[in-house]
């Protein structure tokens, strides 16, 4: 993503990390591990001498100016001023802060705009109405069964024309046959899956049907803990990490009777699509990556290796692979789905959501994984109002006129807006202030660097496969130079942006935006609004696409003639109103008529 690549190149750098570990007076310089913090109370102190000249150089980064006397005072006193910070990291009373410990300040999207938080958030009513479509007869071809949406698979399993064990074996065979091309699976849970499938069949035969996910095989992004099954976060130094308990979402899916079949790939520590096993590829265009960081969920779902998957998003990690791989990606409202037992990248931004082959499937999964959990202080009880049979005519859909005229918008995006108009929605042009939205990423990078402070300072981050300017190792290191003042100002700006989005949603019921529009990826993730990415057509590409910054030494493949790949639009809804964007997405999906298309060769 452009915002990930560019932000720290242009971000202001803080004064805290320019300091080594010396007092104002001259001291001997000693060797130290790169990236290691100053040793509290050490003699001689670690690192180079900090002098008034150090602060003079730092002023260039911070765009501030001190007088000579102020520089002298800062150089003489900085160690005393920051002693408590250093002691927390390296002193005799140093304190380890577990990944599960969230900051004391908790982001609540509704509260940020002045809304009252009651016992339950969201719509006035709890409702879930499935479509009335008949699943039809069970196909004779295994591939046709594998690609069927959960909405159909669940009907076949409920009526016992299809067993969970047979369906599980179909997906296991497809993984064995196709995943060598995709590298979407980190850990195959074959024995676990077959045992769960047999249990599901036994329960259903006994009349103990748990609901539409009962017996349905799925995969989860490998940042969700699974009891006694390794959870690697896509990183080499975590490849043998085996949790003692399931993540809350995995436990909820287990309670729904779903069958965990695979732990799916993610870009290492949730960035892009390269993990310790290689790059996850796009089944529609195997010469390019699947995008990330929910690369495995996107690729495996698109290739019919699982019935559905669970991805995560911090700044585009559901939207982007859903677009690239041509699947449906639902990013829930921040706080709707508990993240207990999930890898933390950014406490105030991380979200978990379904990636499926259809809109109704996404809502079936969302219903199962929603809810509050004591382990996630940001999770809230929220009603879900979805009626697949309800009309969409009369709704107001906002759009940004300028964005629809320029890249990354395409004719497919513009046609989708016209389709909504034909379906009876009223298009309403909306605007946002011309603000530097990417500066919000101060919060993201500071939180991410805090989450991974230990591996940054002990050097393990250097073992990650991707060591380029826009990968986490460099970003974590650079984030040590961010200003605490800029972090607070970014957080305050976040509230202003949330108020602007609240203003827009007083005028419209939902937004339609080009999926990869950087400004809206940033804005909607920081404000916590839900999004639904729906495939509505195809585009032709002459070159493979990549999440990474261009590298002249490794040019991307080009194609003549151009290749046809999926393309979709993204709908953004009011806070906790996933039901409205799903209703509209379902109508748009039917109008487009491309959701059932499959990648050639899979």
What are these regions (language model features)?
Residues 124, 131-136, 331-414, 458, ...:
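A short helix-breaking turn/cap at a secondary-structure junction
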Residues 160, 215, 255, 259-262, ...:
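Glycine-rich, small-residue loops and helix-cap segments
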Residues 161, 166-172, 198, 408-431, ...:
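Acyltransferase
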Residues 212-352, 400, 438, 446, ...:
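Short glycine/serine-rich loop/turn segments
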Residues 128-143, 214-233, 391-400, 442-498, ...:
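Short helix-loop capping/hinge segments that flank enzyme active sites or metal/cofactor-binding pockets
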Residues 171, 193, 215, 221, ...:
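Conserved hydrophobic/aromatic pocket- or pore-lining residues that grip, position, or stack substrates
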Residues 182-233:
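N-terminal, positively charged, Ser/Thr/Ala/Gly-biased leader segments
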Residues 2-20, 24-195, 422-424, 480-481, ...:
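An N-terminal boundary/leader segment
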């Amino acid at each position: 993503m452009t915002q990930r690549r560019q932000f720290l190149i242009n971000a202001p750098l803080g004064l805290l990390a320019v300091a080594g570990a010396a007092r104002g007076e001259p001291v001997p310089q000693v060797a130290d591990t790169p990236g290691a913090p100053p040793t509290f109370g050490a003699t001689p102190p670690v690192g180079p001498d900090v002098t008034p000249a150090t602060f003079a150089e730092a002023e260039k980064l911070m765009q501030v100016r001190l007088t000579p006397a102020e520089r002298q005072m800062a150089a003489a006193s900085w160690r005393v001023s920051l002693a408590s910070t250093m002691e927390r990291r390296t002193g005799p009373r140093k304190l380890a802060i577990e990944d599960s410990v969230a900051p004391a300040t908790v982001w609540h999207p509704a509260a940020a705009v002045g809304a009252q938080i009651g016992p339950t958030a969201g719509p006035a009513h709890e409702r879930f109405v499935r479509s009335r479509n008949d699943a039809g007869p069970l196909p004779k071809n295994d591939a046709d069964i594998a690609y069927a949406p959960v909405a159909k698979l669940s009907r076949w399993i409920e009526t016992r024309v299809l067993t969970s064990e047979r369906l599980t074996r179909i997906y296991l065979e497809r993984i064995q046959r196709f995943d060598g091309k995709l590298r979407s699976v980190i850990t195959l849970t074959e024995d676990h899956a077959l045992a769960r499938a047999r249990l599901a069949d036994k329960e259903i035969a006994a009349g103990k049907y748990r609901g539409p996910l009962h017996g349905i095989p799925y995969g989860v992004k490998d940042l969700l803990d699974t009891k006694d099954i390794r959870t690697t976060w896509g990183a080499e130094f975590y490849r043998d990490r085996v949790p003692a308990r399931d993540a809350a979402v995995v436990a909820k899916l287990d309670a729904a009777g779903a069958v965990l079949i695979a732990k799916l790939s993610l870009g290492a520590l949730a960035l892009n699509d390269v993990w310790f096993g290689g790059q996850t590829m796009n089944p529609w265009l195997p010469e390019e990556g699947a995008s990330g960081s929910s690369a495995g969920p996107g690729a495996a779902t698109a290739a019919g290796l699982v019935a559905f998957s669970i991805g995560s998003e911090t700044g585009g990690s559901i939207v982007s692979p859903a677009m690239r791989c041509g699947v449906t990606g639902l990013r829930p409202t921040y706080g709707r789905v508990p993240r207990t037992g999930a890898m933390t990248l950014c406490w105030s931004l991380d979200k978990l959501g379904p990636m499926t082959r259809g809109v109704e499937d996404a809502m079936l999964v969302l219903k199962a994984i929603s809810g509050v959990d004591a382990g996630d202080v940001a999770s809230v009880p929220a009603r879900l109002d979805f009626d697949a049979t309800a009309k969409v005519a009369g709704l107001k859909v906002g759009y940004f006129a300028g964005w629809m005229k320029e890249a990354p918008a395409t004719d497919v995006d513009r046609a989708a807006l016209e389709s909504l108009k034909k379906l009876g929605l009223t298009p309403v042009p909306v605007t946002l202030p011309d603000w530097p939205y990417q500066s919000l990423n101060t919060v993201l990078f500071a939180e991410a660097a805090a989450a991974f402070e230990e591996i940054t300072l002990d050097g393990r981050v250097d073992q990650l496969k991707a060591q380029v300017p826009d990968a986490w190792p460099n970003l974590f290191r650079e984030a040590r130079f961010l200003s605490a003042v800029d972090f607070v100002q970014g957080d305050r700006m976040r509230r202003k942006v949330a108020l602007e989005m609240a203003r827009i949603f007083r005028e419209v019921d939902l937004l339609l935006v080009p999926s990869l529009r950087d400004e809206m990826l940033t804005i909607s993730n920081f404000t916590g609004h839900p999004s639904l990415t729906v495939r509505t057509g195809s585009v032709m590409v002459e070159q493979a696409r990549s999440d990474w910054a261009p590298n002249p030494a490794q040019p991307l493949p080009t194609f003549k003639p151009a290749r046809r790949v999926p393309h979709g639009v993204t709908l953004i809804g009011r806070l906790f109103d996933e039901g409205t964007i799903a209703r509209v997405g379902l109508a748009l999906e039917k109008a487009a008529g491309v959701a059932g298309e499959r990648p050639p060769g899979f």
